[in-house]
């Protein structure tokens, strides 16, 4: 399963949730909705953390990333990420959206740590 967990916050209160993601151009891209806690937190505080991991007993592999988040709502970059998500995820094909209906969040890594990866 390709899922990660994103952490955002405001007023020093953390919020963590599972998300689908794409890793491209040295960034992590996720889709969200305007009415989510994640989006409202990012509007107030652009810093985010994300964990991507695979867990098998004795073979845990993970990367933890902290970075700055850019909101992508329209234009060529929106279209590029939407096309990638559309091809990759069934849930996007079942419930499509257009520009300004739901944004993408682009997490640009500033710090990272990993284990179990070569």
Question: Where would I find each of the regions flagged by the language model?
Answer:
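Short beta-strand segments
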Residues: 1-34, 42, 50-53, 64
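Short acidic (Asp/Glu) patches
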Residues: 34-35, 47-52, 83-93
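Short secondary-structure boundary/capping segments
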Residues: 20, 40, 94-97
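A short beta-turn/loop motif at secondary-structure boundaries
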Residues: 12-13, 56-58, 98-99
